[in-house]
């Protein structure tokens, strides 16, 4: 995959407006578990095509995966200080928060996409103690149930 990055970067250099190249670059970095580069590539996808569902959706997914990876690291640590734990938790939650607007844009583009609603519902539940997020959770949970035909 690292060889592919060099090839795609060379192709992007001569064709920087090609959404498919940026999309492919983002997927390769995802496979390499380089979430920051993946996110940067997909930000370019969305810059070039703001209403592309997949671009917005995958940005949300990559922020969520990055948050999951940081959360896993955090869970493996031994904490002797509540302040250090709280600081690490804030970093993790801030990454999850970054996912929300991308999923919201994806939801706006494709309102009946169950996966998008499930991500929004789950992330908003996790962040429910943040200002205004519990209301979002209630909204997305209701929409999710409606789309899934639950209740």
Placement of each model-derived feature along the sequence:
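Short coil/linker segments at helix-helix boundaries
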Residues: 65-102
């Amino acid at each position: 995959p690292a060889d592919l990055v060099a090839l795609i970067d060379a192709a992007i250099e001569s064709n920087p407006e090609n959404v498919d190249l940026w999309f492919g670059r983002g997927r390769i970095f995802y496979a390499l578990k380089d979430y920051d580069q993946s996110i940067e590539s997909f930000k370019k996808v969305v810059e070039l095509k703001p209403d592309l569902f997949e671009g917005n959706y995958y940005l949300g997914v990559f922020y969520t995966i990055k948050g999951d990876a940081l959360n896993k690291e955090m869970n493996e640590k031994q904490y002797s200080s509540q302040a250090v734990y709280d600081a690490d938790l804030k970093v993790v939650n801030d990454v999850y928060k970054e996912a929300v607007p991308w999923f919201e844009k994806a939801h706006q583009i494709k309102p009946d996409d169950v996966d998008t609603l499930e991500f929004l519902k789950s992330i908003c539940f996790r962040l429910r103690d943040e200002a205004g997020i519990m209301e979002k959770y209630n909204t997305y949970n209701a929409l999710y149930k409606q789309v899934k035909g639950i209740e």
